[in-house]
Structure formats: structure tokens, C-alpha cells
Amino acid sequence: MFGLIGHLTSLEHAQAVAEDLGYPEYANQGLDFWCSAPPQVVDNFQVKSVTGQVIEGKYVESCFLPEMLTQRRIKAAIRKILNAMALAQKVGLDITALGGFSSIVFEEFNLKQNNQVRNVELDFQRFTTGNTHTAYVICRQVESGAKQLGIDLSQATVAVCGATGDIGSAVCRWLDSKHQVKELLLIARNRQRLENLQEELGRGKIMDLETALPQADIIVWVASMPKGVEIAGEMLKKPCLIVDGGYPKNLDTRVKADGVHILKGGIVEHSLDITWEIMKIVEMDIPSRQMFACFAEAILLEFEGWRTNFSWGRNQISVNKMEAIGEASVKHGFCPLVAL
């Protein structure tokens, strides 16, 4: 059985959907309450592959909120993720994806040292960040979006915002090895990590956001920012493709300009309906079929019997692993969201 650990996009979102999640008493509560709220299994469902195989899964709501990071409630954030992982293990989930900020909190605060959660010793082989599948899906979205807009990738300038992260660095490797894109613009906060990535790739220009964006034919946004940013659409190239791989996805409401096309990055659509409630709550356009690619990775690992931490650690994603999870994705009926 597989699992998905997720969270809501904000305190306001959490209050609005608390009743749908099954705990209406949380609806009027503030951040202090959510900091102490325990994780809960809020959805049970089946997923059917186009091969005919059927598997069962559970959704674990961690009760983590991005405000816990922005308001420096770090201990609460750490506790949320570890407690949700412990619950997933206690209810017998064989492979569980850490969705949204869950994997970021785990990596940034080095939680692999915290493997004892009360009476549960965490087995990290039972968890995956889902980042390999997410990176694969974003790359396929770049390829499809570029084709739809008539952008030749071999002649394109691609800016990757969040280039040193797990997903961003994987996207850079794919675009370099598969397409030899003309220019890779590397954007991130940590200069040393940028220089390390540049050395690994043997290419790429390190730039700040304001300098890079006007030069880019394609922008891949995979920065882990709890709050959205402002991008002036008029300063971007036309046409310009933006693949919004962040969470929550809000660039489509923040960047409005003719000739600027935005794809919801890291989203896949399944060929068959899934009877779950959670994707309605996170406001997918077609909740019975669409989901985050990181969640789909846990589903694929369960279908394939690869019960291991397929995506784990920082900057470990190879093009070969992206190809492997991509083949499984196609085999079981998933496809990236590519309609502009």
C-alpha cells in the first residue's frame, strides 16, 4: 500500500477546507492551533493502471502550513513532517511520497538524524520525495510547450529559478544532455551551490532573477518560496513559456501579458478516474484525474514494486533515473499536463 503526505497552501486555505477534510472544529482556529494539531489519515482510495493493475493508498494530512516557515515556527514544522511520516509507517504504508514543502523541510533541517519519533523508528527506505518524477514531468512540459510555441530548444535560452534544488538541478541535467539548449541561466540564493552546479554541468551562466528573466525564452520556476513573487510580464520575451513548478502555483495570476504562456508544472493527468476527495480540496482542474507528479511517483513505485526511497537526498537525480520513472509513468497511464 502506498501513501501521500501533503499539506494545504496557507492558513486561510486550511480554515476554508477543514470541514471537507473531516475536522470542522479546526475551521476557526489560528496558527497556534494548527502548530499543535496531529497528522491524520483523511482519505483512502484505489488507483487503477491502464495495465489493469489496482493498488490502494492513503492520504495523510500533516497539518503543516507554509506560515510555520515564514513565521519561524521551525520546531512545529519539523514536528509536523516527522509525525506524519511516523503515522504513515504505523498504518502500514510501504512507500509514501513527501509532497509540497514536506521534502524541503526534511532536507533543509537534516531530519534524517531524527529517525526516532516516540515509539516509531523511521525506515527512510519507505519514503520518497517524488522529485525524480516531478523533474521528468517538468522537462516533458518544457519540451511540449516549446514545440507548441515554435521555440527551438537547441537555440533557446532557458532560465531555471531554483536551479540548485533537487528538481532544478535535475531539470538542468536533462536539458543539457537531451537538448543541448543554447543557454542555461542558473538562478538560486546560494552562490556556492550555483558554482558547484555550474562546475558539474561544465556550463551555465549564474545570474540574478531581474537580469535573467528578460533574456529567457523559457522560464522553469522551481524555487521553494512560501510566498509568491511579482514578475512584470512586459519585461519578458514574446513568446515566453513559463513552467510553474512551485507550490502553491500562482504565477498564472501574477504574470499577465500577451505572448506569455504559463503551464502548471509538475502536474500529471491519469488516464482513468480515481475516487478520492483530496484533489478537489487542492483545487485541481480535473480532480478525479489530475495530481502532483510527486504523489504519482509513490503510485508508480507501488505499481512497479519498487518499494524504496527512489528520490532521496539533495541533487542525486540522474537523467537515467528520470528516464526509468518516465517509462513507468507512460506504462501506467500518466501524462504531463501540457495544454497551453
Swiss-Prot record:
Its EC number is 1.2.1.80. It catalyses: a long-chain fatty aldehyde + holo-[ACP] + NADP(+) = a long-chain fatty acyl-[ACP] + NADPH + H(+); a long-chain fatty aldehyde + holo-[ACP] + NAD(+) = a long-chain fatty acyl-[ACP] + NADH + H(+). It is an enzyme of class 1 (oxidoreductase). Disruption phenotype: Abolishes the presence of alkanes. Its cofactor is a divalent metal cation. InterPro entries: AAR, NAD(P)-bd_dom_sf, Shikm_DH/Glu-tRNA_Rdtase. Keywords: NAD, Oxidoreductase. It holds the Pfam family Shikimate_DH. GO terms for molecular function: oxidoreductase activity. The keyword Nucleotide-binding does not apply. Belongs to the short-chain dehydrogenases/reductases (SDR) family. Catalyzes the NADP-dependent reduction of long-chain acyl-ACP to the corresponding fatty aldehyde. Involved in the biosynthesis of alkanes, mainly heptadecane and pentadecane, by producing the fatty aldehydes used by aldehyde decarbonylase. This is Long-chain acyl-[acyl-carrier-protein] reductase. It comes from Synechocystis sp. (strain ATCC 27184 / PCC 6803 / Kazusa).
